[in-house]
């Protein structure tokens, strides 16, 4: 049976958006992210980061630096009881990329490539899954992939997005939605979701 995932954009959802984050000393986790992820894990969601990384394409930092930062962030999350199942990133940009990084790619949101990779590689049901983003491109990717629910965390995107989504001001609102949704599902089915034991990232 396929599992469900909580897809998280990184910059602006997991960490505070500062623009092309690549240094440990610049990382500030978004308020509520640890509690949200722990609750999602308890409700049976796999935790998957899906992030556009145009900073790699532009030459601001390389893939090794990105992976090193993600390893450190993974350790910080783990210290708070949070285990990531996977991190998918797109290092390409169709206009501002340098060399081989200047190209269109289905992984770059609003493309659905990263979501579909997770579906295949992690056996995730997209129609049972949820995405949290802070930009319209996140919402478009979620809608195109047929995700059950998309959330837009207010603060980064300056205009209203098209498509189906719920806009929230804090991650705590999404945590409460997940809890209510789980209660409704359990009431309908009479079954209780089990906790997933994700592998360490």
Model-derived segments and spans:
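A short, flexible beta-alpha/helix-coil linker loop
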Residues: 19-21, 54-57, 94-95
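Active-site flanking residues adjacent to catalytic metal/cofactor-binding acidic residues
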Residues: 8-10, 51, 133-134
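A short secondary-structure junction motif
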Residues: 53-66
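Active-site neighborhood of HAD-like aspartate-dependent phosphohydrolases
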Residues: 2-46
């Amino acid at each position: 049976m396929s599992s469900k995932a909580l897809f998280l954009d990184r910059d602006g959802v997991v960490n505070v958006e500062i623009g092309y984050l690549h240094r440990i000393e610049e990382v500030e986790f978004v308020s509520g992210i640890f509690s949200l992820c722990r609750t999602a894990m308890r409700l049976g969601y796999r935790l998957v980061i899906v992030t556009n990384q145009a900073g790699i394409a532009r030459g601001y930092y390389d893939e090794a630096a990105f992976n090193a930062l993600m390893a450190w962030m993974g350790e910080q999350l783990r210290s708070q009881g949070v285990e990531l199942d996977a991190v998918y990133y797109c290092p390409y940009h169709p206009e501002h990329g340098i060399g081989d990084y200047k190209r269109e790619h289905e992984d770059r949101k609003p493309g659905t490539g990263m979501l579909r990779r997770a579906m295949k590689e992690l056996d995730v049901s997209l129609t049972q899954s949820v995405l949290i983003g802070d930009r319209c491109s996140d919402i478009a990717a979620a809608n195109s992939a047929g995700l059950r629910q998309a959330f837009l965390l207010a603060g980064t995107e300056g205009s209203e997005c098209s498509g189906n989504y719920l806009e929230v001001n804090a991650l705590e609102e999404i945590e409460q939605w997940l809890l209510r949704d789980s209660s409704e599902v359990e009431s309908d089915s009479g079954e209780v979701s089990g906790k997933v034991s994700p592998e360490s990232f």
